[in-house]
């Protein structure tokens, strides 16, 4: 599957206001009220703007942060990290590599047994693809993650 970055004008047409705000304006959605914070489906999470595979449900864990939390991305090469000094804090921002979408932040307070990282990701930046639909939606290569 080939992924493509969309122009801002196209994104404004296809994304909700919140999805656009989060992914294109570095926004943050409200905790504990977003779509995936307590979701437990089996599958992968992709960038809502490009379809790039980002995270798998196998690496998702329950955290008290109010947003979906993952121990690692599917592949580190598909994300980029940068220093974020907004809101009087110093954090590490996580963005999708191709789409350059703001996803959330990564922290070093994740479960030690999972590597110690917590990728705290906005649901509004993600689209969930259920395991049962991976083949039909062009993500067949990721089925092996669930064997």
Curated annotation (Swiss-Prot):
Segments passing through the bilayer: none
Domain MsrB: residue ranges: 8-131
Assigned EC number: 1.8.4.12
GO CC terms, sorted: cytoplasm
Enzyme active site: 120 (nucleophile)
Catalytic activity: L-methionyl-[protein] + [thioredoxin]-disulfide + H2O = L-methionyl-(R)-S-oxide-[protein] + [thioredoxin]-dithiol
Primary enzyme class: oxidoreductase
Protein name: Peptide methionine sulfoxide reductase MsrB
Source organism of this protein record: Clostridium perfringens (strain SM101 / Type A)
Lineage: Bacteria, Bacillati, Bacillota, Clostridia, Eubacteriales
